[in-house]
Amino acid sequence: MENKEKKQMLTTKLTKEKNGGSAGMIQDMSINGIKLQVFQNGTGGPVIFWGMYPHQQNEVEHLWESLLELVPEQNFLLVAFQVENWNRDFSPWEASAVFGKEGFAGQGLKTMRWLTEECVPHIDRTFGVKDREHWLMGYSLAGLFALWAAYESDVFSGIVCCSGSLWFPDWDHYVRDHVVQ
């Protein structure tokens, strides 16, 4: 049995134990080259889209387990999507390097278009969740991306910005000149 299969089986087993024996659904998929992990707890509740970097794989499972522990009766669908390049794919516009040597390529709009035009519709169709609340969350630069998405799109009814990179060059000017959708 491959490592990935063992990991998925372990996650499913943990889900069954923490959820009183009823397994939540866990599914890996890819949409236009971007990897997703989808965790479903129950049949209702919000759809939470979480932008993350590929090396944070265990973070998805940790969040899943934490949610089941904190609010075991809350139904939700968690969709973790993995960008290829953190500074490129989550930055709303180009900016020089702030920490280290790598600058910000400003491809956030491309990521948001993929998210709102491909990912969200696919998840809505596949899981029948079009009428449920859709939230976007992220940590650090992905948190800034989530907040920026609130100004650029009306797809999400809620935003979770954890320790967002609000230091990002010209963010203060952007917020002053734009309105949340």
Language-model regions, residue ranges each:
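Non-catalytic cap/lid and distal C-terminal segments of serine-dependent acyl enzymes
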Residues: 6-181
